[in-house]
Amino acid sequence: MTIKEFAYSAQQHLEAQSGEKFKRAHIYELLAASFGYNSFAALCAESIVFQGKQASKHSSQHNLDLLRRCAELGYTSATVDIVFAELPPLIAKQRLSIVNIPELISKLRGESSYQNGYPEWDADDYDDEIEDNIIFTQSDADDDYYQDNLSPGLLAGLELAAEKGNSQAHYAIALFLMPDPDFDQTPGSEYWYTQEQGGRVLTGVEKEWADEYVQSINNAQKFEFHLREAGRLGNEDALLDLAEHFDDPSFFEQGSNGENHDPLRVAEIAESLGRIHDVHEWLTKAAEAGDTEAMRRLIEEFDQDDVQRCWSWVYLAQLLDTDLTRDDYYAIHEDGSHYDDDVGGPMYVDGRDGIKLPSLSDDQDALVRQTAKSLFEKMQ
């Protein structure tokens, strides 16, 4: 059942039970209140309503929200009581629940994988731990979290939101479809696809392989479409993924404050695009956030002509318990692993020299130490 169908059914049911007319728009508002939102517009801005596999749980706060919203819409106390008694069971009967899109995106960004067969979602192939945490209701209690398999209904809800210009919905779909770099296409699938395109009639496993290749093409096209749409609508995460996957420089051209991005990842992507200025900028952000390896690289590759700047990185690293001026050498095996005396065998040396910098005057040194201290305090 779609949300539109549910709203119509609920409207008919409540009118029959109360003898009072309900506006269809009010049903949507009451549905939103049942999930803890002040309005249906607020719900749609960050969540997807969909039909799951089990009834969602509602907290006492949700019940209060429903009572409040019903009264705000101008219904009599008798009608409010009927709505309170009748609407939650209707929602439970139809197994309606919500997924918060930002939370869904957060899970997918950490555990995204190649999804074979979209939109026919195969929940059994998805990691159980993610299933147990990814779908939930707006509840203030951990045991009220609603758990459900990722489903065609959820994807349909995301697509509907995407059609209405929701950049986060576009991005969530793109993450569903993001190709896994470790995914290996079945050997021969491209060959059999080419044969079928040439008019050969395939059967059995050859047909399965050709269909698998078609599906991978479709997934890749949908992935790029939704990613580009999310980027076009201003989603910075999507723009960064576009830079990584399609060498699209839009992320860097529009500028970003970097608060929500891993600066080392951004620096790596910038370097792959040959944007050296941006590499410097984002390594600096990483260093200012406390990454000592970024500090070392800045000293060696970017800030080497500014001795005071280099010393500020050295002193900042020291405040973070890292001495960049100390040589760091260690024994390894031939394969590069750290040397194990119990294993024995030939011993090799690996490592790197400590940073060597020209000395500063006392005044310069005091100024640089204060700069490092200020940067350190900003991290706290």
What function would you assign to each model-found segment?
Residues M1-L87, I91:
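C-terminal alpha-helical interaction appendages
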Residues D127-I135, D142-G153, D184-G204, E212-Q221, ...:
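Helix-turn-helix repeat elements of alpha-solenoid scaffolds
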Residues E159, R228, A243, T284, ...:
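Alpha-solenoid helical repeat scaffolds
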Residues I299-Q380:
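Long, ordered, amphipathic alpha-helical scaffolds
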